[in-house]
Regions:
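Conserved ABC ATPase "signature" region
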Residues: 27, 38-53
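Conserved ABC ATPase signature
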Residues: 57-61
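Hydrophobic anchor residue at the start of the ABC signature
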Residues: 71
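Catalytic Walker B motif of ABC-type/P-loop ATPase nucleotide-binding domains
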Residues: 82-86
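Helix N-cap at the start of a conserved alpha-helix in ABC-type nucleotide-binding domains
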Residues: 93-94
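H-loop/switch region of ABC-family ATPase nucleotide-binding domains
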Residues: 117-118
Length: 145
């Protein structure tokens, strides 16, 4: 892995520019690196299930749609390291399944994924190692066999 690695980050409550569409928000982020073209943006919007809402203003997005856009922003540059804070927060059943599949795809691509999640079943499904942290201290660590 290169250092510093290409990193994608999803914070628990992602925020974007309200008067811009989902597509425009991603295009603005993409302009920072200059390595992401419109086809890549459209592809990532398809992966997270926002193709039909790409031109809709962000302020009109539901909480789940905002979360999906945050996931799209985190993965659109094909990071080596992906840090996800509660990636399934505010998602419906389809959104949770889609997000789990995206995380699997990223891991299969060789991405190191670090995530927080309160849903133990999701962690057990997706993670090789699980750490329970209480008051800043690792209480239990478990590994998939």
């Amino acid at each position: 892995m290169d250092f510093p690695p290409k990193m994608g980050v999803l914070i628990e409550n992602p925020a974007f520019l309200g008067n811009y569409s989902g597509y425009e928000n991603l295009r603005l982020l993409a302009s920072i690196s200059g390595k992401i073209n419109s086809d890549m943006i459209e592809d990532v919007l398809e992966r997270v299930g926002l193709s039909d809402s790409a031109k809709k203003k962000y302020r009109k997005y539901s909480l789940g749609m905002k979360q999906r856009l945050g996931i799209a922003a985190a993965i659109m540059e094909k990071p080596n390291l992906l840090i996800l804070d509660e990636p399934t927060n505010a998602l419906d059943t389809d959104g949770v399944q889609r997000t789990k599949e995206i995380i699997r795809e990223e891991r299969n691509r060789g991405t190191l994924v670090i995530m927080t999640c309160h849903d133990r079943a999701i962690l057990e499904d997706l993670c090789d190692e699980i750490f329970n942290i209480e008051h800043g201290t690792v209480m239990i660590a478990s590994t998939k066999d």
